[in-house]
């Protein structure tokens, strides 16, 4: 399966599909959308109101890959379930951390 992130000199940009009010804060592995694009499935307890779910997603990803919260920001999709999230840091280390996270859950 293809990776749901792109590498850059600053870090990685991750394609995610968010489930707000998902019962828990967790990364649920990879999913392939109907158009064939892979995304990282993320669920958060926060509601999709006033940017709460977006903040929860960036905080969850920061903790999961081991970077400060200030290194994770929303690139696009502020009002959509599908988002692009930038994570600043060493691209190789971030890619390895993301691979480990999604490998722990089966792909759909």
From Swiss-Prot:
Family: Belongs to the UPF0235 family.
UniProt-listed HAMAP family: UPF0235 (MF_00634)
Organism of this sequence: Rhodopseudomonas palustris (strain TIE-1)
Name under which the protein is recorded: UPF0235 protein Rpal_0418
